[in-house]
């Protein structure tokens, strides 16, 4: 078997050849393979980086390093006084990618925005059924019932009419699931009967043009010479897929990649001492948690879920899995930096005897359950195997037998969304800086139906509070509603909230213009590499 470093020798040789022609290359060591490139079907951060952040743009964007909404494909927008109408004015002359499989004949216009959203909204749209995994984010956030219509005002103006006010709507329009597609490319593929190509050969307006993908090896892009914000400083972007964080660190130290994502937290102090490297860190919008499948008996009983929370020695797990100072204990579904975080809620103490008593009360003694974990790492789960083993030992002290199943990330998501798990070790990276972005995709009734809510938990009281908080615009009123919702969440215990991790990335000190993001997405449109 080839050593992992040797496996990428063809990549290194190819880049050396490119370097001979003085092309400017950026190789990023990433932690997993994307699920696909038709971003509307997926919610994973890896997939968003490989598609939304490279190939596509949205009507709005976030200022790099912040959650501030700024113009994207729309250069300006108007909101009606009643909060029900949003009019977006598109930039003129924005070009879609020209590739060997698509040659656009026109610039971006309102038809592309309508095609993008009608595809998800209208079951009769000719492209609706092409999303074989459905419209995960779109459905989980209730966009189908929120958006009344999407109207073409003129070639460069689009109006969204809502059924109710939605406080985070502008933020939503900057999220990966709202990426704008080419209607012309869609028509071309439909006419040729090649709808599946949309997920394999994407076309967008973004800073990089997709070239090719080799699963579990690499994704290659070239800079978009026609990018509306200006051609990126680098000519070629390569995502070198490297599951093992130790190998990622070896490669960035050896210069085989210039950026390496998500080092193990315990390695960060040592990496900071390397004069050739720079470590970027930020208090990110991240939550690590274990979803408890509330549709599996006896996990449908709140007392059983509370018992599982009580059995865990969370502090010991965080110290071992993340290391000192790299994460704080999670109590609720989102970090304390967001609106309405309820500081009055006390975390579950480590109390295995109380856990045993609750299990006995619920008639769930000698409980046997299975935990799904990923076989790689991520910023929310730097060592899934160790976390699972520690949970297994803690649960055993409360009389619970835990079986651990390690799965490839895409397979874990597929099986968890199908409800095959009892417990699933997961993480969520906020996409827009609003509390609703943690709650609706992961804990709403709509998300339970679609499988994105992997606790499969649907609580009418929680749902009502969450929905009302979306509809009101006053931040103080929204905060009170979210505080109440977190009380319901804590009492019902559909998750074991684990951690609010910090985010770390490592780069060669020749890399400039890279901005680490609290939303945990990675965009290299302004990144350059010094010779």
Task: Please identify what each model-predicted range represents.
Residues 89, 112, 121-186:
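Surface-exposed binding/hinge segments that line
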Residues 75-127, 159, 251, 298-300:
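Aromatic- and charge-enriched surface segment that lines or borders ligand/interaction sites
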Residues 208, 293, 299, 328-362, ...:
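Structural transition elements
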Residues 29-82, 118, 125, 201-205:
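N-terminal lobe/hinge region of extracytoplasmic solute-binding protein
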Residues 193-199, 224-270:
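Ligand-site clamp/hinge motif
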Residues 222-225, 284-307, 311, 320, ...:
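A bilobed periplasmic-binding-protein/Venus flytrap-type ligand-binding module shared by bacterial periplasmic
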Residues 24-30, 50, 167, 214, ...:
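Detector for C-terminal structural segments
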Residues 33-50, 73-74, 100-104, 167-179, ...:
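A structural "hinge/loop" feature
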């Amino acid at each position: 078997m080839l050593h992992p470093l040797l496996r990428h020798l063809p990549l290194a040789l190819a880049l050396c050849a490119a370097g001979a022609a003085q092309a400017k290359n950026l190789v990023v060591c990433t932690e997993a393979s994307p699920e696909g490139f038709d971003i509307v079907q997926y919610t994973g951060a890896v997939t968003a980086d490989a598609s939304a952040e490279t190939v596509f743009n949205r009507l709005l964007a976030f200022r790099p390093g912040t959650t501030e909404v700024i113009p994207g494909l729309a250069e300006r927008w108007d909101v009606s006084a009643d909060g029900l109408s949003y009019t977006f004015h598109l930039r003129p002359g924005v070009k879609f990618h020209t590739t060997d499989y698509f040659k656009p004949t026109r610039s971006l216009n309102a038809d592309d925005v309508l095609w993008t959203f009608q595809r998800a909204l209208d079951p009769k749209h000719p492209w609706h059924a092409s999303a074989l995994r459905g419209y995960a984010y779109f459905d989980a956030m209730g966009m189908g019932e929120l958006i009344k219509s999407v109207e073409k005002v003129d070639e460069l103006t689009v109006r969204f009419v809502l059924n109710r006010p939605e406080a985070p709507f502008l933020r939503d329009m900057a999220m990966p699931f709202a990426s704008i597609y080419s209607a012309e490319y869609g028509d071309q593929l439909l006419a040729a009967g090649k709808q599946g190509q949309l997920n394999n050969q994407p076309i967008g307006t973004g800073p990089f043009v997709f070239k090719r993908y080799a699963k579990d090896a690499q994704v290659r892009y070239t800079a978009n010479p026609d990018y509306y914000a200006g051609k990126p400083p680098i000519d070629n972007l390569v995502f070198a897929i490297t599951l093992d964080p130790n190998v990622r660190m070896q490669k960035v130290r050896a210069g085989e990649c210039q950026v390496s994502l998500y080092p193990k937290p315990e390695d960060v102090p040592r990496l900071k001492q390397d004069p050739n490297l720079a470590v970027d860190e930020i208090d990110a919008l991240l939550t690590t948690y274990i979803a408890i499948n509330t549709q599996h008996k006896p996990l449908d009983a709140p007392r059983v879920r509370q018992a599982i929370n009580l059995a865990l020695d969370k502090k010991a797990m965080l110290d071992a899995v993340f290391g000192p100072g790299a994460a704080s204990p999670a109590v609720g579904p989102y970090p304390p930096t967001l609106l309405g975080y309820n500081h009055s809620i006390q975390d579950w103490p480590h109390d295995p005897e109380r856990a045993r008593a609750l299990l006995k009360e619920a008639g769930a003694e000698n409980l046997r359950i299975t935990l799904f974990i990923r076989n790689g790492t991520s910023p929310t789960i730097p060592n899934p195997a160790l976390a699972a083993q520690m949970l297994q030992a803690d649960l055993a002290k409360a009389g619970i037998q835990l079986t651990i199943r390690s799965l490839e990330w895409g397979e874990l998501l597929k099986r968890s969304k199908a409800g095959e798990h009892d417990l699933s070790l997961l993480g969520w990276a906020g996409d827009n800086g609003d509390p609703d972005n943690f709650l609706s995709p992961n804990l709403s009734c709509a998300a339970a139906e679609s499988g994105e809510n992997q606790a499969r938990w649907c609580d009418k009281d929680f749902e009502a509070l969450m929905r009302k908080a979306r509809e009101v615009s006053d931040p103080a009123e929204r905060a009170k509603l979210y505080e109440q919702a977190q009380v319901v969440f804590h009492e019902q215990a559909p998750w074991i909230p684990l951690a609010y991790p910090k985010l770390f990335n490592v780069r060669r000190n020749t890399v400039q213009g890279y901005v680490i993001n609290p939303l945990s997405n990675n965009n290299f449109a302004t990144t350059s590499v010094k010779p």
